[in-house]
From Swiss-Prot:
Function: Stabilizes the interaction between PsaC and the PSI core, assists the docking of the ferredoxin to PSI and interacts with ferredoxin-NADP oxidoreductase.
The organism of origin for this protein: Guillardia theta
Protein name: Photosystem I reaction center subunit IV
The keyword Chloroplast belongs to this UniProt entry's keyword annotation: yes
GO CC annotation, single: chloroplast thylakoid membrane
Amino acid sequence: MVKRGSKVRILRKESYWYQEVGTVATVDTSGIRYPVVVRFEKVSYSGVNTNNFSLDEVIEVNEK
């Protein structure tokens, strides 16, 4: 189960961060469509370093 502080790899192909690893900032349990907020080291073209994903668009990884 993905929880706050977990390292996750992004599986959404159209995402700027596709196949990148980020840290989960929060997981919303209220039933919204994209409940997982992920924070990245790298910023996108518009200067953003966070994005929302659904639970099936992220996979937890064990990076040291």
